Design a protein with these regions (language model features):
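Short, solvent-exposed loop/beta-turn-alpha elements that line the ligand-binding surface or hinge
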Residues: 116-128, 164, 173-179, 214-232, ...
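Glycine-centered hinge/linker elements that transmit conformational signals in sensory
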Residues: 183-192, 219-253, 279
């Protein structure tokens, strides 16, 4: 797309940065809790590099702990519990959360009210997708976090394999061939016959099913199983037995290898952050040989929200970070163009698409119309604070079933046992 430099806007941004630096009376250390490199990259590339005066004299510390097995939450919980007694330079200022466990932190006094405590206005977040605000709104209606992302999903597939097996790599035509699960299964059989795997492994389709559940994981204190979860189990067992998948686990080396230029996996259920942040780019990768379509059913997956921590002495900086990264249209466009992220503004994406946005990783396809269509219908009404644990434990328990190590009844017993160990207040 054509990149336009608007001199007036740039001058205003510089002036705002100078004014901010002059009036900031906060602390000298900014502590940010994260689980991976994603937010540090967005912070450094789209905030720190463009607002150097805002951080003059301030040391930024990223405290990073992996998300798996509840490690990040455990680390964050410990720090939040000690927040009141921590030294000023040791207090948490910002921390990241994701959808699977957002409610755990939103409905507490550990998170600052974005409007009342931090100072953003309703007009600032007006263009953000409603579901991204609903996820981080507490039971009293207070907004407790913001995100630069929206996360509508689809199916990202290899163009060259589509041409070879299906006769076309055109996203609209490929979509017509996989527009429901029966058609998707039929294409999986064709891919197998041609020497390819439809999916990488056991977990690839999980989010496409799980995000379409009608009932939450937990009602009261009872674990519930939605039919969509059973459909995922049935399909994945079939794909594993028939060789339609490569029997890999998500995030494994085998799964990543399937994404490389010489990989044999046809496609992955993905959202913007997945193919931008998790799929290989550069030498040896299949960059440019991918395309994006809606897939058999719409879904969303994940997303990162930033929350201000109660007790922070850097509220001015927190406000500036939140506004710049999640409310400022020019910054959001920049994130989309340079990082490939699906941004949290339908208006900004519409402008980018109109201006000829192309994604090089996707063979210069414009995926924004798909994002705009799927993003408008996302609902998170079935979310609970137990989602991360339940999602992780069901995938772990069923892996043994998919591999033939246990029968289905045993896999279910193992699932319930592991969830109740994690959340002792629950029952099957």
């Amino acid at each position: 797309m054509t990149k336009r430099i608007v001199i007036g806007a740039c001058m205003m941004a510089l002036a705002a940065s100078s004014m901010f630096a002059a009036k900031n009376k906060g602390g000298k250390v900014l502590n940010i809790y994260v689980w991976n490199d994603e937010f540090p990259a967005r912070f450094n590339d789209f905030y720190k590099s463009k607002n150097p005066k805002a951080l003059q004299g301030v040391t930024v510390n990223f405290i990073q702990t992996p998300n798996q097995n509840n490690a990040y939450q455990d680390k964050l919980d410990e720090a939040l519990l000690n927040q009141a007694n921590a030294k000023a330079d040791d207090k948490i200022d910002l921390f990241c959360i994701e959808a699977d466990y957002a409610l755990k932190y939103v409905d507490t006094t550990y998170t600052l009210d974005v409007m009342k405590d931090i100072g953003l206005k309703a007009k600032d977040v007006a263009n953000q997708y409603q579901y991204t605000k609903d996820i981080v709104t507490d039971s009293k209606g207070k907004l407790k976090g913001v995100s630069w992302q929206s996360t509508p999903g689809g199916f990202v597939y290899r163009r060259s394999y589509a041409k070879e097996v299906l006769g076309t790599d055109d996203p609209a035509k490929v979509q017509a061939m996989i527009s429901d699960w029966d058609k998707f299964d039929a294409v999986a059989a064709k891919m197998k016959e041609a020497g390819y795997f439809m999916l990488s492994g056991y977990d690839d389709a999980f989010r496409a099913f799980q995000d379409n559940v009608k009932s939450p994981w937990v009602k009261g204190n009872k674990i519930t199983i939605d039919p969509q979860i059973n459909r995922w189990i049935e399909q994945t067992k079939t794909y594993s037995d028939k060789g339609y998948n490569n029997k890999a686990s998500l995030w494994s080396a085998e799964s990543t290898q399937g994404m490389m230029k010489d990989g044999k996996v046809f496609g992955y259920f993905a959202v913007g952050w997945f193919y931008d942040f998790c799929m290989p780019h550069g030498e040896g990768s299949a960059e440019g040989d991918w395309a994006f379509c809606e897939g058999p059913q719409g879904f969303s997956w994940g997303g990162t929200w930033i929350c201000g921590a109660a007790g922070s002495d850097n509220v001015d900086i927190i406000k500036d970070i939140m506004y710049t990264l999640t409310c400022d249209t020019n910054t959001l466009k920049d994130i989309c163009v340079k990082a490939g992220d699906c941004i949290n503004s339908a208006a900004a994406m519409q402008e980018l698409s109109k201006d000829g946005y192309k994604n090089a990783f996707l063979g210069n396809q414009d995926p924004l119309p798909i994002y705009l269509k799927n993003g408008a219908s996302i609902s998170k009404k079935t979310m609970t604070k137990y989602d991360q644990g339940c999602n992780e434990k069901i995938q772990a328990a069923m892996k043994d079933y998919f591999e033939g190590k246990v029968d289905l009844d045993t896999a279910w017993d193992n699932f319930y046992t592991s969830v109740i160990e994690l959340y002792p207040n629950l029952k099957r």
